[in-house]
Amino acid sequence: MAVIGSRNATQYTDKALRSLFPSFKKVNMTIVSGLAKGADYKAHRYALSMDMPSIAVLGFGHLYHYPKETQGIRNQLEVEGLVISEYLPNQTPQKYYFPERNRLISGLSKGILITESKSVSGTRITTHCALEQNREVYVLPGSMFNELTKGNLLSAQEGAKIVLRPSDIINDFL
């Protein structure tokens, strides 16, 4: 399951992942995400803390790291999980690499879970990649008054499945 969302993820993402991940672990789900701060970081941190498999997809070569806030979790993933990149080892981060790597995040997964998303964001790009790849798209419910969940609502309007409990995702994969 790919977990995607805002780089400015709030406690809403924390609470949702804490609620969902124990059930994901019971069915041996692997977590896939980028290595950005926010939702990506939180997804990897929770997965590793629960001894769940976790895969990070870089938007640059292995000899670099960005952002510095996620260096510690990357170090842990290199030992306890998997860190991959389609770029040459010495390739520096470039702005356009991050949307490119989003197709790998969704492509490695049977589905994606959107935690918090603005109406225009990298999360929306990953969502469109997932739809093109015939992946399931799941979304946490959001508020029309919260900028960080307007993208969630747009995804729901486009057919994403709203997640209220772990079984809303797990039942699709059993």
Model-predicted segments: where are they?
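Glycine-biased, small-residue-rich flexible motifs in mid-sequence functional cores and linkers
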Residues: 1-174
